[in-house]
């Protein structure tokens, strides 16, 4: 989701949320909020649900309830094409699911640490991507935190980061822009574990009626293919759940 040139919110989740609101027969108003304060502002009553690419994680479930997941997009590292980190082959794996505790997954983490030892990895603060680096790569990489994905993408392009870790979709968006022409993915796509169980809407624990309404709309939109069509329109591929 982002602001267009007219200052209006647009994006896959804006279209998704507007469609869900129409099906629920309610009028919804979008509110912008800095990421670091997004859950506290929900709990303070500034808005009634978070629809903002928030991954469903056990840590967040301690504070809020989540709707059924409606989108999922793995996380991946991106580097400059001329970087020594380009085209990393990590344990021969294209995808690493951290919910699996097998030898291949552990080997992949070990090889990733060895490849990126001493490098600066840039991530958005208070995200699952920061959590991954702190849990699995603490001490091996220098973690540089940013308030917004756009900021760390620009620093990657300028050579101030050796790599960034973010959602696949946000990196693709950057690579397709003028500023990201020299950027490429490297290594496998990560999911599970600290990356959670897909993207869902977050509501206050006491708001069970709101949760039920959204879950009904999400199920309907998943069944009839609406969410799939929205994600294909915005991401060029189906990342619906």
Descriptions of predicted regions:
Residues 1-3, 59, 85-87, 131-132, ...:
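Short, solvent-exposed loop/turn elements at domain surfaces
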Residues 1-54, 62:
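Extracytoplasmic small-molecule ligand-binding "clamshell" domains
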Residues 11-24, 81-103, 120, 127, ...:
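Extended ligand-binding regions for polar small-molecule ligands
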Residues 14-15, 29-40, 105-109, 143-158, ...:
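Short helix-initiation/N-cap motifs at beta->coil->alpha
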Residues 21-32, 115-117, 135-148, 160:
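A local structural motif
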Residues 26-29, 34-37, 55, 62, ...:
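A conserved helix-loop-strand patch within extracytoplasmic ligand-binding domains
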Residues 37, 53-63, 131-137, 150, ...:
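A ligand-binding cleft/hinge motif common to bilobed small-molecule-binding domains
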Residues 72-76, 168-216, 237-241:
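Periplasmic-binding protein-like
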